[in-house]
Regions:
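Glycine-anchored, exposed beta-strand/edge motif detector
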Residues: 2-10, 25-28, 47-172
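Intrinsically disordered, low-complexity regulatory segments in eukaryotic proteins
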Residues: 15-25
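Small-residue hinge/turn detector
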Residues: 31-32
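Beta-strand repeat architectures
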Residues: 35-36
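Proline-centered structural pivot motif
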Residues: 39-41
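Short, flexible helix/strand-to-coil boundary loops that buttress conserved ligand/catalytic motifs
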Residues: 44
């Protein structure tokens, strides 16, 4: 429950609770409160202000924290797992699991992916297979890596957070 405060309403002292999620104009003038994650809900922000995200249909199931690739799926702007082995560079990442055919919220690179595990603080990471990351970049001189994607993704801030960088990619 959000914090409450005392206010004079129609000549009487009343306890009023801050608004966590706005229902729109009915909440005009309310004081806002942080949600359970310690952040403001997007519904209380002005139009045009909020997370820089893109909505796309998932053409396959996506796990939380996976890096994804935009593509055209039969004329539908869609998203699938990024993969260094089959030419699918990473365009962004998802923070929540998404079922196939559901709408995914994709966060662009240059943000923090906080849904990973097993990272080493300060280590650099590259795109792996099936939306994952790897601590070892592909060897450009290995003929077995021909036509694979070499894409630096960022540096680990913690065991679960990768500060991503939109550094581009190279097809080997």
């Amino acid at each position: 429950m959000p914090q409450g405060f005392l206010a004079r309403v129609a000549g009487r002292t009343r306890q009023i609770f801050a608004t966590v999620v706005s229902a729109g104009v009915g909440n005009a003038g309310n004081i806002v409160a942080l949600d359970a994650t310690g952040r403001l809900d997007e519904s209380v922000l002005p139009v045009g202000i909020g997370a820089d995200t893109t909505q796309a249909v998932a053409s396959e199931a996506l796990g939380a924290g996976k890096f994804v690739n935009y593509h055209d799926d039969g004329g539908v702007f869609s998203v699938r797992l990024a993969d260094n082995s089959n030419g699918r560079h990473a365009d962004g990442f998802v923070l929540e699991a998404v079922a196939e055919a559901a709408t995914a919220t994709v966060y662009p690179l240059d943000g923090t992916n906080a849904e990973l595990t097993g990272l080493t603080i300060g280590a650099r990471y590259w795109l792996g297979t099936a939306g994952s990351v790897t601590a070892m970049p592909l060897d450009e001189t290995d003929a077995g890596n021909a036509n694979k994607i070499s894409q630096y993704l960022g540096v680990a801030k913690s065991a679960t957070e990768l500060v991503t960088d939109d550094d581009g990619y190279v097809v080997l």
